[in-house]
């Protein structure tokens, strides 16, 4: 891609009646980058020029601060051998949060040489999403070992440090041999899915709390960067629990999984004209 193609694409969007574009630039900016958190400068320049052309054509932006499973890091998130999962580890690893901050801040607070503005302060930026499809993070299979400490803290607060109350509530779901909070193991995803016992309820309440807290964290960071518009997250899940996680969002964004491009984002790719019902 180059400036000419970026300008032509922006003009084509306007010609076809679009007035807003959603963009998730992390993978593209890290392609060919030299180190974690350091963008490919040619691609960053092209992104800023693209924003300029979109603005010229009256097109607003909805921005995904992060979408890749490895964020603003070197590597290929689509590689099946890639074991990093930032959508999960962002809840427990400060290094992942720092990676999110470094990349997001560069995009939003760097003065665009073509528009002369910081995107965070430009009315062109209409909406922001903290992390695309973050629901995948706390729905991954397996045991959530890294969250065990926060899980125990949550249970201590809920049951007011009275292990007897937890034991009575969990009944036969209390792991064998466990006699106090600090001996509780990490929970497994399957223990909280499609179950109605109190331990399952506690697991889901805990996950909802983590997701709500993450939304608050995203909002604080965006505000600190100078963005004053609507912030949201959890734009994929459609369960009742997901609705609770979005309760304090400024708006609801919801992905619809139909009419995918025939050849991903490559030139000549086509989109079906069928409806979501038709597909």
Can you name each region flagged by the protein language model?
Residues 232, 243-278:
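Carboxylate/His-rich catalytic cores and anion/metal-binding grooves
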Residues 1-220, 224-230, 234-249, 261:
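Active-site mouth of glycoside hydrolases
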